[in-house]
Amino acid sequence: MANYTAADVKKLREMTGSGMMDCKKALVEAEGDFDKAIEILRIQGAKDVGKRAERSASEGLIAVSGNTMIEVNAETDFVAKNQEFIDFANKVAQAADAANANSREELEAVEVDGVKAVDALQELSAKIGEKLELKRAVTLEGDKVAVYLHQRSADLPPAVGVLVAYEGENEEAARAAAMQVAALKASFLSTDDIPAETVAKEREIAEATAREEGKPEKALPNIIEGRLKGYFKDVVLLEQPSVTESKKTVKQVMDEAGVKLTGFVRYELGQA
């Protein structure tokens, strides 16, 4: 005869976050001793962390606090939308912002409720039963930063996050620029930010492609410049057609709004 009740199992699940069958097994092993059952589950959870370390964690969320953005990963979207996981990520983001965290190492070192984030993460991993990972963090310099977070579906936390640093008073225009980055994935703010070797390589590709197409020699310079401009429109934020006013570039829209963009960063869940 079982020396525990359904209420005991329910209470143990609520206290530890462990699965129902794990709670039942722990109560059986502990012969109904509640405190001992908790200890058994904690030990088992710690053992399982090592096994989980080999598994892939590609779900999760993007969280933002102030000028800082972080990515925290889990194995499944079921855990990604777990409120405890979301609350943990938001707490870490706040701590990362206070510390101006700018790398994975700095992110892991921030403290949450008096505990290093990486240690708090392992405790949560043992409780939830999935591999969790503090993947990356960035702090964008600037007195003013516009934020845009995009959810892939209404029941999931943000999977894309953008920070845009700007000067000026039009926050709405700056946020529109952040939405632009989320949608069109610009790689550079201006053409001046593109490395010279990258421009040279694109020029080589444009010329080689034009020659393969049999374009007239005299027309090559104009064709190459035209294709370079097309490349810039794809990868340079200020050169892209605005998603809000398609006949204007982002630079034109920002100039009209009295906004100067000074930097941006884009995170997408599961990408480097």
From Swiss-Prot:
Residues 76-79 are annotated as: Involved in Mg(2+) ion dislocation from EF-Tu. SUPFAM superfamilies: Elongation factor Ts (EF-Ts), dimerisation domain, UBA-like. The keyword Cytoplasm applies. PROSITE patterns: EF_TS_1 (PS01126), EF_TS_2 (PS01127). One of its GO terms (molecular function) is translation elongation factor activity. The keyword Zinc-finger does not apply. It is found in: Cytoplasm. Keywords: Cytoplasm, Elongation factor, Protein biosynthesis. Pfam families: EF_TS. GO terms for cellular component: cytoplasm. It comes from the Bacteria. Its main location: cytoplasm. Signal peptide: none annotated. Belongs to the EF-Ts family. NCBIfam families: tsf. Associates with the EF-Tu.GDP complex and induces the exchange of GDP to GTP. It remains bound to the aminoacyl-tRNA.EF-Tu.GTP complex up to the GTP hydrolysis stage on the ribosome. This is Elongation factor Ts. The lineage of its organism: Bacteria, Bacillati, Actinomycetota, Actinomycetes, Mycobacteriales.
